[in-house]
Amino acid sequence: MTSSNSTVPDSRSETKKFLVLLLGSIGVVYGDIGTSPLYAFRESLRPFTANGVQHEHVVGLISLMIWTLTIIVTFKYVLFLLRADNDGEGGTLSLLALLMKKTGSYMPVLFFAGLIGSALFIGDAMITPALSVMSALEGMKLVTPAFSDYVLPLSALIMVGLFAVQSKGTGAVAVFFGPITVVWFLAMAWGGLIHIGDDWTILEAVNPINALWFITHAGWAGLIVLGAVFLTVTGAEALYADLGHFGRKPISVAWFILVFPALALNYLGQGALVLSNPAAIENPFYLLYPEWALFPMIILATMATVIASQAVITGAFSLARQAVHLGFLPKLMIRFTSETNTGQIYVPAVNMVLFIGVLVLIFSFGDSESLATAYGISVTGAMVVTTLMAFQFLRSIRGKSAFTAAILLAPLFSIEAVFLAANLLKVHDGGWVPLALAGVIILVMWTWTKGSRYLREKISKNDVSLDTFITSLERSISRESRSAPVLVSGTAVFLTSVPDKAPSVLLHNLKHNHVLHEQNVILTIWTHDKPYVADTDRVEITRISKHFMRLDINFGFMDDPNVVKALPLCKKKGFKFEIMQTSFYLGRRNLIATPNTGLPRWQEDLYIALADFGVDPSAYFKLPPNRVIEIGEQVAI
């Protein structure tokens, strides 16, 4: 009886936890894709408006939208990619880390694919807030045309407020994201349902034959339209990127029981409305609703778009943290805004870049119609990259042959490649914007990675073996020779990225100060290609000699690299740190560009600028400021 009764609370607790994750996934994961009906069908129809919209065009478009959602989101992301996790974490960089760990080698093609996918996602994080919020507010034009002049300033004002609150954390308001988004999806389903009866022939769109007919008969205009059709799956990458926050099951269940049905019903309703009333092409989404519901829907849409914007901003913060830990970006200041949820972070540098980018996009494009042309490229590009990496996943992780992996992914890749080609046709109409943004981000990450690798190779030429150095030093101390340093009480910690070489800061300290602490710790901080490291594996201590020991602290690429919090774990390994008796020695390198080196001069200058932009290691690793001693050195690159 006892064991039977004890399982009931456990079962209820698990159910409650699942429902919380389910609700959260609806608000965060599906916020972006849930706002696509605001503009996707409207923009897809635009090329046909000049000659009049034909029945087969509407049915074909809606069929294409529904089956794009089915193939791309359902099959690729929900049923396949959600299973391609790195210890529970998803996303482009997480998949890249998993593949590089499995292959055990540096693969340039894989590396650049990861950079391209990440860069395109950052571009998406700029365009999504601008496009979605403007689309929502433009509905006010249906209430009163006089509101047209206020769309831009109000959109900018909302963005100012959204980015301003990032530093405070979103935990307090995030609890409302799920319920608001659930109401939004239900409202979309209702709007579609009440209009499907306007023209029952719209149900023919469920047949994929109509989608194929549209592709083969719509001609050049059809290829252009494909770029707009892909707007229906914007935000699909969030399913994979947020896998670690919510888990596969809640994300999958939310898609099948609410999100997909609501989207399909809304698109079917918009199609039936336009078939029965061609004038509704002006704004088919808002015209689904009765006049009394229009203003509430505009308010609800604005809240939904803000939530969608928050989702991509959070995703950009998370991606930046992964990029820093994996060595693709310099160390950035990362602040945790929640004591219980490590996924809630704030990255000031990324926040500022996104904020400036969003405002520039809002005032440069002026309306959602113009900005929509720029949107598809970043989304399709990121998806194509993910599919290419999925090919390597099937080979390296699942053990499939290259032929089998190609057969499995060829249909998906072909579809996405066609969509990408369609979007590339819009380069001159604004599509160059996400490409330019991605190009800049790729250049930054590539320069940092290449420069860091070159700097390590150059410094290593002058390295001194740690074991040889310590043996010589201990011998001089035991013999009390004149060259022996003065021993002082306390513990000194010397940070180094190369544990088998004597840290340059240790050498400089002995050279200039001629002192050595009674206990000296050679500390190396490792960031592993898995999301988290358990506390039991966090620290490793090795005694080298009487006065020296080696300490390795292990973090995952999603962990908070807090050294002070990790040090107490050393007590279980036989060494207790007294923080107030411990000094942390860091080397500060002053980089100087020099001619005739391994990097072009412009890349040297960019690397030095990035190094100056990065946060101090003492702040990044949360070292106590009053216990840190920095010793500088000039390094020519």
From Swiss-Prot:
InterPro entries, per the entry: K+_transporter, K_trans_C, K_trans_N, Kup
Alphabetized Pfam families for the sequence: K_trans, K_trans_C
Cellular localization per UniProt: Cell inner membrane
Annotated transmembrane regions: 18-38, 61-81, 107-127, 145-165, 174-194, 211-231, 255-275, 293-313, 345-365, 371-391, 402-422, 429-449
Domain of life: Bacteria
Membrane-protein topology: Multi-pass membrane protein
GO molecular function, one term: symporter activity
GO cellular component, one term: plasma membrane
Family as reported in the entry's similarity comment: Belongs to the HAK/KUP transporter (TC 2.A.72) family.
The name this protein goes by in its record: Probable potassium transport system protein Kup 2
The organism of origin for this protein: Agrobacterium fabrum (strain C58 / ATCC 33970) (Agrobacterium tumefaciens (strain C58))
